[in-house]
Amino acid sequence: MSHAIDELQAIIADLKTELETEPKSSVGVASNSRLARDRIDRMSAEVVDSNPYSRLMALQRMNIVKDYERIRDKAVAIVGVGGVGSVTADMLTRCGIGKLILFDYDKVELANMNRLFFTPDQAGLSKVAAAAATLSFINPDVEIETHNYNITTVENFDRFLDTISQGGRIAGQPVDLVLSCVDNFEARMAINAACNERNLNWFESGVSENAVSGHIQFIRPGDTACFACAPPLVVAENIDEKTLKREGVCAASLPTTMGITAGFLVQNALKYLLNFGEVSDYLGYNALSDFFPKMTLKPNPQCDDRNCIVRQKEFQARPKPVVIEEKAVSEEPLHATNEWGIELVAEDAPQSNPTPAETPVMGEGLRLAYEAPEKSSETSEETVTAATADETSLEDLMAQMKSM
């Protein structure tokens, strides 16, 4: 009897493994009744209904991104495929990212249905398997790799380290970016340690316990503060890990807050990967007051992570970029005591005769209402005669009147 039970358990284990490795065969995940589109070799900017990349490639035409198709050369690792991580993976897949590497060891539950990604028929599946099936159906051009294990254990941490170090689009190259979408302190510290050791840039993200605020933080080892540079509750209040994890998990969760946080995360990831716009070092969100704080956190010289100290020294040893300052050209006044440039003219200075205006060239059907009279030579002579007469003395005028 016990032998038969062991055989049945072995069969069940094999079926579970097959279910995770072949997610498309799962009921409701990506059923055969839904026909997936064919793979597309190159992104096209052609505006047709059948082109899923036309609106993305329009970013080039609008001079936002220089070469959007470079996104196919990028590999991104997402740790945590929950409320924020699943939506992040969905957005990057729709943007046409080259490769996604998903890490999570949890299963889909009905309690997750208030999120934006998973569906009730996926309950019981591992999150990475369910996500991979759905994402592959959305965009078959994206290479998706899944890892169903806890990265915080010693053995799995080494596997995680090797994956992000050699899992890039080019074999043996590191990933281009790591996105942390986990909900506990221990996992964040594991990601922080791995990225500090391998000198990889990464984004940390999170949503508050009351579900009305969130944040993202861009961490560049040595340049900005790592997650261990400002240790939170564990060091400050000596709280054990179980208590911290219970407090850190969102007791409440809103799909709106998670969607906004995921949107901030992907938006800044795209800006970093495609080199456009300004990447925020820290961006927060408070839903109650619609407040979006931004700041930059400098690394702690006494950080407990020794690799962080090494990266800080390496960053300080780098040559600083030379900033060429343009010298301001001082405009000296025309006159030292006359800043308005007013010029004085003597009363006996010769007056320049104004040049008569030229008759403008009129279009067909147009004529001038009147023409200015031209000064003739006769008019000038009369003027001279009148001026001469005006110079006659009073006695001469009296004599002329008496003789009349």
Swiss-Prot record:
CDD domains: ThiF_MoeB_HesA_family (cd00757). The keyword Membrane does not apply. GO terms for cellular component: cytosol. Residues 382-391 have a biased composition (Low complexity). It holds the Pfam family ThiF. The active site is at C250. ATP binds at G83, D104, K127, N150, N184. GO terms for molecular function: ATP binding; metal ion binding; UFM1 activating enzyme activity. GO terms for biological process: neuromuscular process; protein ufmylation. Belongs to the ubiquitin-activating E1 family. UBA5 subfamily. PANTHER family: UBIQUITIN-ACTIVATING ENZYME E1, UBIQUITIN-LIKE MODIFIER-ACTIVATING ENZYME 5. This is Ubiquitin-like modifier-activating enzyme 5. The lineage of its organism: Eukaryota, Metazoa, Ecdysozoa, Arthropoda, Hexapoda.
